[in-house]
Structure formats: structure tokens, C-alpha cells
């Protein structure tokens, strides 16, 4: 979390500075700064949350802001379409994360990372339950981190102003899925071994074909 906080704030600072000049002549200057500031706040909430609920609030925040930013020039049909594609695709991933949260709470009685991971490490989480949670979290990660088959929104994200592409692509939003799986590593370890193979295979196929 500390490392991600440094990365998010550093990248965001550079993007904000670049935006001052890049968007200076745009009539939506103030609106754009409001969006990227809210995006940064949401990303920090995502990486600093102590439990899955706070992380999910940040998760939804960056998803909503990505829609606002990608479709910023909404008078262009291509930008409006790209924004809607990003919004809908990420909702599929959100369904996966919500399902994982419900499963974790039903099994452990808490949404705290510490509580869930402790249960996974001490055998308090059955392998079948851990596998279900891991796979649903991976569905969420596929949406945010643009993995197959939910990668289709990312190329169209270029329809937004250049600072948007920098903020979304440069070690912030697209890394949030990887960050989530890393924080839940004990659950992945408690899951059936094939779950790791699924994650690795999808990642490799995304790298080759997406």
C-alpha cells in the first residue's frame, strides 16, 4: 500500500502539472481538474483501504472517473462511445469483486484484509471457498487491469485528453487489479492450484493477443 501510494501520488502530480498547460485553452479546464483530482482521491482510497469495502468504494470511484475522463469531449461520438464501453466493461468486473466480497463475508464474517488472510493462512477458509473468492477477485481484476476478455475498453481510452491516458495507463488504474490480488495472496495460496494456472494463462494470453 505504501509503495502504491507513492506511485499514485507521484504519477498524479506529474499529470496535474502537465495538464496545466495542455488544457489551458480548453473551456472545460476546471471540470477536467475536478475529475482528475477525484480520480486521484479514489485511487488513494483503493490502495489505502484496510478492508474490501473501502477498497470497493475507491474501486467504484476510479471506474466512474474513468468514464468522465475518457468521455470528457463527449460531443465527439467516438469519445462518448469509448466512455460508455469503459463504464459497462468495468461493471462486469465489479460484479466479480462484489461476489467475492459476499463470499468472504459469509465464510469469515469480516471484510478486513487481515481477517480474511488470517483465516486463509490458518485453515479457516476451505479450499473451495478460497478458490471461489480468488476467481471472483480475478474477474474484478480482469475488468480494471484490462485482461482478456475485458480488455476491450483500454485501447479506446485514448479518446480522452492525453493526461487521461497517462493517468489511467501509467501505473495507477490498470494496476489496481494486480494490487488487489497481491493483497489477497494468502487466499490465492489457499485456493486449488489450478486457480493460479488460470490467472497466469489469462495474463499470458493478454500479453500475446490483446
Language-model features: locations:
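...captures the hydrophobic TM-helix bundle architecture rather than a specific catalytic motif
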Residues: 1-210
